[in-house]
């Protein structure tokens, strides 16, 4: 094996435009130092200069200068791309400049010998491969949506429990069994109002389950040609929504849930489609900019009901803004679903569709750390949103966050999968999936770490390789990187923290390394975190 000569590249970080002044930069031995941005660099004996050195305010595009080589020329630093620019703020020579927000420009290591040989992965049952040189955008946390799962009034759980996992959306109504009329509708409205308040606080949308407010007590819409009761109910709901200031894009109208399931729809397919049309037109007339989604079918993204729905919507000009479906029966895959529904929409020329929403995912058998992590990887790969199914009964329906916590809001092992998913920042890394195993991975030079959430859709036990290629220089100074491997064991009991399997430096060869997981229980989930040693 040929040794690798490492050259470390430095990245510039910026956060809102303000940067601390460096405390005296210095020249490298025998080299020419790069300068900071917006000030005069200091001098010293070895090291690097960062930002301003005793000068005017550091510019928003400024950052860290390059490291001077020993006996050679220095490598220019890369500047961050931040908000405000101070006086005199040009980026460092050779740096990357831009505008807006907090970013780090990830710099790749430069191999000293291009003839080196990457490590050969050991024999394994399955593997995933990461290419850290291939960036695929910022985090969106697509899979962190929930159906009910918080208190009926929306005040619980504590906010920190939700923000840590980057909640993406809520979905709620309130099924009330009893007399059809104002009393039942008022109970249902209190839940919607409470959930909306929490969603607004977190800056995420609420999907209103219209049928959950109506179907359990009232006559089927259009029975005998009579739409009076349903129209009255819709009028009341629309009036409440308008009075509560809920007419913006942070509210989505889901007009009926799982009409292809006999437990939620007793009529014909044609009657359901007419119900969709009546509700759609009533909402559109009252709130022209309303966001409407559907059909939320139990049979997935394809099939006869979905095809009939899309054809009907096109013919009657009642196309939803978001198309939704469920994979709650087991065996679903967001990537395959996205391909199926995209083709169906494109074939029909439904240009008004804004996006897709798999708003119930995961059977009871799939709600474990391993399969949940696999789902998260698939949602990010597909680029569509997902909301966890809620299989709880009674009061737990409003206190389990989709089986992520105990009834007194204590995190369990699945919660920690979503917590590490929420911890991911920076730029998504290209991942080649295995047969049963997939991963979602991000790197963030500003945060100084890369987090890899690894999932198993079921069945695979034994050795699983996580092959990591093109590791950037900031993660491997001196030819090694620190690898933390955490295990989230299957189970519903409270878990204060994941189990640490290992935490040690790993050798990097040809900018690559291999982390091997001994996956003893397929339903466990794993997280790999890389940091500089």
Model-derived features with residue positions:
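Non-catalytic accessory regions flanking glycosidase/transglycosidase catalytic cores in CAZymes
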Residues: 16, 21-29, 33-37, 41-45, ...
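Glycine-enriched alpha-helix->loop->beta-strand junction motifs that scaffold or abut catalytic
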Residues: 166, 318-319, 383-386
